[in-house]
Regions:
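Extended alpha-helical targeting/anchoring segments
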Residues: 1-186
Length: 186
């Protein structure tokens, strides 16, 4: 199973994707380009591709880029769909189950990372850094309920919910990482 609910900021509405015709997963850096070529071909045929490329896939694009181990999630995963349905996230009502999250990174490692980032900025190795870290927690809430809660707490033009048999991704990003439109990448 690979289903998705995506906010279309151009149309100001939600699109639901179910019944994937195929699913493409990259578990190694070498697999990432193959997956991206496959979805590009499908999109050129008028199909929809929904998925993600993780930050941990960086070395697939430039071997000089350092990344943390990917863990159990694929480096990239996309599903191909023949159509999308207009939808709303209304079917996913927030539950009353508590969600307590704690950072996986320790305070000392966090401080060391911030100092390293400042060093990169001062030396000109980077002009911008998006420092992220994982949070871990337990809840009885469904992934859909968590996504609904996040959408209400932080409305975003780039919200996406992906649910598979093995994991769910709830994203309420305020920014677009990249977009491909014909021969243009922005």
């Amino acid at each position: 199973m690979f289903e998705a609910l995506i906010y279309d900021s151009d149309e100001q509405g939600w699109l639901r994707f179910t019944g994937a015709s195929s699913i493409h997963v990259a578990k190694t850096s070498d697999d990432v380009a193959v997956v991206l070529d496959t979805i590009e071909a499908a999109c050129s045929e008028g199909k929809y591709a929904v998925g993600y490329v993780s930050f941990e896939a960086a070395s697939a694009f430039d071997s000089a880029l350092v990344h943390h181990p990917a863990g159990s999630l694929p480096l990239a995963a996309f599903a191909i769909f023949d159509h999308a349905e207009e939808a709303s996230p209304g079917g996913m009502e927030p539950g009353s189950e508590p969600l307590e999250l704690a950072p996986v990174i320790g305070e000392s490692s966090f401080g060391d990372s911030i100092q390293q980032i400042k060093s990169y900025l001062r030396s000109g190795d980077s002009y911008q850094v998006n420092f992220t870290h994982r949070l871990k927690g337990k809840t009885a809430a469904s992934p859909g309920s968590i996504f609904s809660f996040l959408c209400r707490a932080q409305p975003s033009p780039y919200s996406a919910f992906i649910e598979t048999d093995d994991y769910a991704i709830c994203s309420v990003s305020p920014e677009l990482f990249f977009e491909v439109n014909g021969a243009s990448i922005r």
